[in-house]
Amino acid sequence: MHLTAREQEKLLIVVAADVARRRKERGVKLNHPEAVAYITAELMEGARDGKTVAELMSEGQQYLTRDDVMEGVPEMISDVQVEATFPDGTKLVTVHNPIR
């Protein structure tokens, strides 16, 4: 199987997000890379499901709370940006202050 660099990056995000999701379910607080991967993967899946950019920008602030992550992580993540594939093409989704 041959994957492009973009496909490899998406796959890496999904794998990291899966690890983060399992840790979150066990009550383990997520670190910075895990939190970013978790939010990014949720945004990518929402786009594939047909949600709008505006919906994802709003929902993206609800995926994780301060209780889900290690101390200091919310302050480290001011924005999460992802080029997500929507039914009508690829668009940039930006979520400001995603962890509240």
UniProtKB/Swiss-Prot annotation:
From the Swiss-Prot or TrEMBL record, what is one GO molecular function term? urease activity
Q: GO cellular component terms? A: cytoplasm
| CDD domains reported in the protein's UniProt record | Urease_gamma
EC class, as a word, reads hydrolase
The record's Gene Ontology biological-process terms are: urea catabolic process
Reactions catalysed, semicolon-separated, are:
urea + 2 H2O + H(+) = hydrogencarbonate + 2 NH4(+)
Q: Tell me, how does this one assemble?
A: Heterotrimer of UreA (gamma), UreB (beta) and UreC (alpha) subunits. Three heterotrimers associate to form the active enzyme.
Protein name per Swiss-Prot or TrEMBL: Urease subunit gamma
